[in-house]
């Protein structure tokens, strides 16, 4: 029997000095990682709420979502003290309401989540290194090979309408994980069986002014993956048999592509990114090889 194994690791190195080369299609900023994302950050408070007197700007919802009456009281106290959220100072279903996400006031201008609050995330959409490994074995007339590949050290912001967004629209469906686990609370009917104040995703919205769909770290996911890209198994007929067909080698094989993906990324496929496209298909093919 025989075997062969090869691997490769390609790391990318950040350039924190002058930019002297072109060719990258994303953002390039001196002193920042290549492809570092620039986005809103979700507000995260202590959850203590408003207890009277001067409002504590750090006492809001722990995960940034308005979930309870106490959260709403704190938001109203903030508005009464001159703060705004995405430019809004009104609590209403078609504006800022239960199940909405609050964004951080990164620049301290008392407007939480306006366009000036975007900041570098410290994460990049460009993998820090790519890994590949292939090996092949053969025993007598049987051969076997496989190819693995992976990418590590990057993040993807998956916030695509109708795939990972709580926006609803006529004629479009809602993806299952959001349909089954979105926030719902009607203060006029707290006993509504649909109530789900611990929902993982924001409330479903249609035509509201407040925006839960902006690019933020709420929808940022670690996109590391390791894939079994190909397996091939073959069998070569003994030469004493193949010679009867006037060929020196006759080999049959089965090849399987995109067999396994190991990842925590919840989107379609971390290899194709956040774009909406058909994911890489799992394929099985059969073939033959003839050498005269």
What are these regions, as identified by a protein language model?
Residues 146, 252-254, 288:
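Membrane-embedded beta-strand positions of outer-membrane beta-barrel proteins
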Residues 1-3, 7-17, 161-171, 267-275:
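Flexible, surface-exposed loop regions and adjacent strand-edge segments
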Residues 1, 139-141, 150-154, 230, ...:
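Transmembrane beta-strands of outer-membrane beta-barrel pores
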Residues 81-85, 95-98, 151-246, 250-251, ...:
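Extracytoplasmic gating/loop element in the C-terminal half of outer-membrane beta-barrel translocons
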Residues 1-121, 183-189:
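Conserved small-residue
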């Amino acid at each position: 029997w025989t075997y062969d194994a090869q691997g490769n690791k390609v790391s990318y190195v950040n350039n924190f000095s002058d930019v002297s080369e072109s060719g990258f299609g994303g953002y390039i900023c001196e002193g920042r990682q290549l492809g570092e994302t620039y986005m809103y950050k979700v507000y995260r408070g202590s959850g203590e709420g408003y207890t009277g007197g001067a409002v504590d700007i750090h006492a809001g919802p722990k995960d940034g979502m308005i979930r309870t009456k106490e959260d709403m009281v704190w938001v109203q106290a903030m508005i009464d003290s001159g703060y705004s959220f995405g430019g809004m100072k009104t609590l209403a279903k078609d504006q800022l309401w239960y199940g909405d996400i609050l964004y951080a006031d990164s620049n301290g201008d008392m407007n939480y989540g306006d366009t000036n609050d975007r900041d570098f995330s410290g994460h990049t959409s460009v993998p820090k290194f790519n890994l590949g490994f292939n090996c092949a074995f053969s025993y007598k007339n049987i051969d076997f090979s496989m190819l693995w590949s992976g990418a590590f050290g990057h993040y993807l912001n998956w916030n695509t309408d109708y795939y990972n967004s709580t926006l609803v629209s006529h004629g479009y469906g809602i993806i299952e994980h959001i349909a089954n686990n979105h926030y719902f609370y009607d203060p006029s009917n707290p006993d509504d069986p649909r109530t789900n104040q611990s929902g993982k995703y924001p409330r479903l919205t249609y035509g509201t002014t407040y925006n839960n769909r902006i690019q933020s770290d709420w929808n940022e996911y670690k996109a590391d993956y390791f894939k079994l890209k190909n397996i091939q198994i073959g069998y070569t007929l003994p030469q004493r048999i193949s010679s009867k067909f006037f060929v020196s080698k006759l080999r049959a094989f089965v090849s399987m592509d995109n067999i396994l993906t190991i990842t925590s990324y919840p989107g379609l496929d971390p290899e194709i990114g956040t774009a909406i496209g058909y994911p890489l298909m799992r394929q099985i093919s059969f073939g033959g090889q003839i050498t005269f």
